[in-house]
Structures are given as C-alpha cells and as structure tokens.
Amino acid sequence: MESVLTRSQFVRWRAAIFAIFFASGLSIATWASRVPSIKADLDLDNAQVGLILLGMGVASIVGISTSPAVVARTGARRGMLVTMLLFAVGITLVGLGATLFASVPVVLIGMVLFGFGNGSLDVMMNVEATAIEQQMGKTVLPVFHAFFSLGTVIGAGIGALAAHLTTTVAVHASIMGALIAVVAIVCFFQVPSREAALDPTPGEQQSWGDRMHVALEAWREPRTYLIGVVMLGMAFAEGGANDWIALGTEQGHGFASGTGAVALAVFSVGMTVVRIFGGPLVDRFGRVAVLRILAVAAASGILLFILGPNLPLVLVGAALWGIGASLGFPLGMSAAADDPAKAAARVSAAATIGYVAFLGGPPVLGFISEHIGLLNTLFILVALVVASGLFSGAARPLREDEKTAAPTKSA
C-alpha cells in the first residue's frame, strides 16, 4: 500500500491542522482574557493565580513529555482528538469552578486537564505542521502559528465582549469548550492516518522501540539545546503576555476594566500579522536575520509596555511585543525539522523546551511579582528575548552534508 496522499486528502489534512492551531489559541485566550474576572470571583492574589498557573504548567510539561511516546504508539491523529477533548472539558471546568461553584480546587482541576491536553496537543500539531511544511518545500509553519494567534485574537475579543456584557465565566467557558470539542471531532476525520501521512512504506516501518530511540537521541544533540534557547526566550515572552498582559494593564498600570483584554488582543493582532506575512521575509532574508530584528522589536515593546505613561503607548508596546515574539517559536520548529529523517524527534524535543518556558514561565512571574510588582517582573522578559536574539545563529538552515543520508535500498 502506498503512503501517498491525494491532493484532496492533503488539502483536508492541512485545513484540519490550521483549525487545530486556531482552536488551541482560542482556548488559551478564553482563559487569559478572563483572568481578572476569575481572580475577582475567587478573591485571589497574584501568588494564588501563579499557583493555579503552576498546576497548569506542571500538567502541560507532563503532557509535552509523554506526547512523543503517544505519537510513536498511536500516531498524532488519535492523540490530537483525545487531548483536544481533554482541554475542552478542562476549560469548561475552569468556568464552572470560578462562578458556579466558586471553588479553587475545581478551577485547579480544570487547569490541570487544560494544561495536560494543550501541552500534548502542541507537540502533536507541530509535528503534523512540520510534516506538511516538508511536503510543500517552503516556509509555512509561521502561517500555522498565525492561525494559533488568530485564535487568540478572536478569543481575546470574545473575552473582552463577555467582560463588557458581564457574562459569567461559566457561560463563556462552557460555550468555548463545546465549540472546541466539535472542532476536535470534525478534524479527526480529516487528518490522515499515520501510515498515510508520516510513515515510510510498510517494509521500512520502524518498531515502537526504534521510534522511541530516535526520539530520545535528539536530546543528546547540542543544536537542539541552542535552538531551545532561541525558542525559550520568545516562548517565555509569548506565554508571559498571554497570562499577565491583562493584569499588567489593569492592575499594574491601573487602567479601566476591559482594557486588559484589549491589550491582549492588540498583542495577538501584532503577532498574527507577522506570522501570516513573515514566511516570504524569512525565505528572502533568512531565519537568523529575521530572528535578530524581531528580538529587538520584542525587547523594545516590552520596555514600552512597562514604562508607557498612558494607555495608547502601552498598547503600542503590546503591539511591538507581539510582533517581536511572533516568529521565534515557529522558526525554531522549522530549524529543528531541517533534517526530514529526524524531524519528528527534533521537533518534539525543541517543542518541549519551548513549551516548558511558554507554560512554566508565567507561574514563576506570578510568584516573583508578589515581591517586586508585576510590571517590574516583566523586565525578566526583556533579558530573555535579548538572549534569544544573541543565540539565533543556531537556527541557520542545515547544509546538505549535515543532514542524515537517505538509506540505500537493496535490490
């Protein structure tokens, strides 16, 4: 049986992965845009919010760490269905726990399910997206991440509207959870099986043990860690914005209720625009040059967000922040996938490093902010994005002689 997709199958596969990226962004913005409401409903301080985020972050890291084994055993298709349903249930529990039960434990359980599901999904959908990019032969991974950002833009907009209309978090989150579950089921039937999409022909298929060996081997390669530094700084900046930009706007600067969701939306718009149109720029100027320019933009934007004396300047800072943090993660994933023979293993390893920062960083910021203030804490992000820019040379494309040689078939 040939492992070749028809044009129609490929288009449906690509559309399904676009939709999955969008749903992931939508789910994160649903939580992030309602953090002030959840905090008020449960009467939490920043450290307690940070503790809830820590529960989500730990669960996410567990999900990320186990996802390569799941992909090796069952393929991404089934794994993505299960994990999307998990975080759909999780985001619904967060809403119910915040306003219906007024229970921190229920919210924490919801965030753990949400974190585990989203963490696992992030690795799987990026493995699928890099496989699509390899088949297309051009830089398209930023466009997939643009759909994630588009999901956060729309999610933040819905969150701002819900906050303005004083819609309870329970109603808002339940509707979003149901929508995500529908997307998961529809996409399951559009994503091809592992054998059709990603595996070699039956005679060349690897055992599960061989797949795990290749996956673990990526962790012994220095380039994986250098790419990880690039991704870590930008992922920390993106995750910090998703979870703290709303509170930084409303409580750090003291602006009106609802302006936090607006700042998150502005950040997400900046990120989305660059991800949509950034691919051709990368193909023309190269990954390294683009990453260095964006690191300067991110550092400048975060500084302006922290120091801006009025709302318009703070929003300009949020936009620059989003623009600068836009391509660090997807270009890191593309760099990890330069060698098709080891793409899945290296993408999984790089994604793990990036998502540890993306999901584990915000709780750390929360705890630190209790001692030095939220806006002062964001200076940490400036240092991290500068480090990301300095290490961006690791993302240069591999030469042909640096790639794994294709196996020769015996006659």
Model segments located where?
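Symmetry-related core transmembrane helices of the 12-TM Major Facilitator Superfamily/SLC fold
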Residues: 170-189, 376-395
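Primarily marks hydrophobic transmembrane alpha-helices of the MFS/SLC 12-helix fold
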Residues: 77-80, 84, 107, 291
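C-terminal ends and interior cores of transmembrane alpha-helices
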Residues: 85-101, 297-309
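Helix-to-loop junctions at the C-terminal end of transmembrane segments
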Residues: 63-76, 163, 274-287, 369-370
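Hydrophobic core of transmembrane alpha-helices in multi-pass small-molecule transporters
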Residues: 22, 102-121, 313-326
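Intracellular juxtamembrane helix-capping segments at the cytosolic ends
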Residues: 119-134, 326-341
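Short amphipathic helix-loop junctions that connect adjacent transmembrane helices
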Residues: 33-47, 243-259
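C-terminal transmembrane helical hairpin of 12-TM major facilitator-type secondary transporters
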Residues: 285-332
